[in-house]
């Protein structure tokens, strides 16, 4: 069950996504006063865990302004210790009531992991190890 606060924030994101899909985004939070206040503190209303793919930009997809979302981006949405700690910071310190997991089609990391499975280059191990359970159907 979702809290009333989280539902309210989810509705904002859904409305923003509707604006994006319809090609009618609204300009938000770009005035100098807002930018200056954001230099002092942040008060996002949602945390979005997203792939680092350059085509997936949560602020644009949800038609949000600067400071409205706490965005954690990582290739393949691979959740490791740093990602977990970032999300925990958003929830415990910034008190965001809503966590969104934003995936996408045609993920290059997932394709690469699938092509290399079970062999993987050492420098990709931490990312690919976290997506292999998904490829195996165990995640």
Protein language model features and the residues they cover:
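Catalytic core of membrane glycerolipid acyltransferases/transacylases, capturing the structured
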Residues: 46, 55-72
């Amino acid at each position: 069950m979702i809290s009333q606060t989280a539902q309210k924030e989810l509705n904002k994101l859904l409305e923003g996504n509707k604006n994006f899909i319809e090609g009618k985004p609204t300009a938000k939070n770009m005035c100098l006063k807002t930018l200056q206040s954001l230099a002092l503190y942040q008060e996002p209303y949602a945390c979005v865990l997203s792939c680092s793919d350059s085509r997936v930009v949560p602020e644009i997809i949800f038609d949000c302004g600067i400071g409205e979302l706490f965005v954690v981006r990582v290739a393949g949405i691979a959740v490791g210790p740093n990602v977990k700690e970032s999300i925990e910071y958003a929830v415990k310190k910034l008190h965001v009531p809503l966590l969104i997991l934003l995936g996408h089609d045609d993920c290059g990391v997932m394709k690469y992991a699938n092509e290399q499975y079970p062999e993987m280059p050492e420098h990709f191990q931490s990312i690919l190890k976290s997506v292999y359970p998904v490829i195996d159907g165990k995640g």
